[in-house]
């Protein structure tokens, strides 16, 4: 169990029994950003999109076993990793959950021999928070919509 500012939570590798709760959490997070909630195809098929390709997907669970955050990481053959779908339940942001998820994904990439991790930030107006979050964690802009970090 990890201690957030207001609650305890744990981070585990994805299990299919959490699929519906994960999807609901992501839709809520997108809605809170003012986006029309839609689900990305990879979230419907975590195993084939991440784990079967050598990557990994994690979820953060609260004390009631509800999904409150997620992140995925795919490993590329060129020594790079790509981070995907870092979301935290909108009313639980700024409690260290996103940072903990990011740290786990970076550790996974590093342990698997990757030297660089990259992130596509999405559109500037909708995903404005990510443009502050990643640089705070050592990521550098490589163009207007992408950041990367040497591991």
Question: Residue ranges of each PLM-predicted region?
Answer:
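Short, Lys/Arg-enriched N-terminal segments with co-localized hydrophobic residues
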Residues: 1-6
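A structural preference for long, well-packed, hydrophobic secondary-structure segments
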Residues: 84-85, 90, 107, 111-114, ...
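Conserved GNAT acetyl-CoA-binding A-motif
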Residues: 102, 109-123
